[in-house]
Curated annotation (Swiss-Prot):
Residues involved in [4Fe-4S] cluster 3 binding: 94, 97, 102, 137
PANTHER family, alphabetized: PROTEIN NRFC, PROTEIN NRFC HOMOLOG
Record's keyword annotation contains tRNA-binding: no
Taxonomic placement: Bacteria, Pseudomonadati, Pseudomonadota, Gammaproteobacteria, Pasteurellales
Protein name, per record: Protein NrfC homolog
Residues reported in the UniProt entry to bind [4Fe-4S] cluster 2: 58, 154, 157, 170
Amino-acid positions noted as binding [4Fe-4S] cluster 1 in the UniProt annotation, renumbered to this chain: 48, 51, 54, 174
Record PROSITE patterns: 4FE4S_FER_1 (PS00198), 4FE4S_FER_2 (PS51379), TAT (PS51318)
GO molecular function, one term: 4 iron, 4 sulfur cluster binding
Signal sequence region: 1-28
Organism, scientific name: Haemophilus influenzae (strain ATCC 51907 / DSM 11121 / KW20 / Rd)
Function per UniProt: Probably involved in the transfer of electrons from the quinone pool to the type-c cytochromes.
Keyword entries, A-Z: 4Fe-4S, Electron transport, Iron, Iron-sulfur, Metal-binding, Oxidoreductase, Repeat, Signal, Transport
Domain 4Fe-4S ferredoxin-type: 39-67, 85-116, 118-147
Amino acid sequence: MTVCSRRNFVSGMGAVILMTGTSLPAFAKENKADKPKRYAMIHDENACIGCTACMDSCRDVNQVPEGVSRLEILRSEPYGEFPNQEYEFFRQSCQHCTNAPCVAVCPTGASFIDKETGIVDVHKDLCIGCQYCIAVCPYRVRFIHPIHRTADKCNFCRDTNLANGKQPACVEACPTKALTFGDMNDPTSAVSRKVKEKPVYRTKVELGTQPNLYHIPFQHGEPRR
């Protein structure tokens, strides 16, 4: 687990936008069957306890080697005085951007957005390990798999748990239910409802990436700047 200063912790996340939920107008409420799925995730920073069960489960289910990780939980410096201290935990992983720079720069088409789910993924048989996608990703969440020698990252367990009708490994493992996953194009889904009902933010939205990883901000420390 990474420990960093409050200033570095906040500045490293880039600019954020806070949003409050609003109801969709009647004309915008389309039948969910009219659209493909757009999977998204919410990380609740108030519920997360930094136990890293999500990281361990991801590593196990997706056979991620030691030394690399598809997701990280970053921990801030403590707020308050001992013994009444609290920590802020931040999930860092692929944002599954609707406008993904990694897809745009890939010379072989290995980096792609799955049309059925909106998940950003990698065709390992097409990847040549050029690392263009790693260089261009503003979230710094891609890496070269040390065994396959291809680009790798979180893919919401698309080829493991999701393929078997389960939730992503991190969601299933979280003991405090800090993660919510589902289809943003389904207005009845838990993730869609929560984005409308809770104050949420996404990181580096000013870059136009349209990330699909949302965060419910930590309420007990300093306000984000």
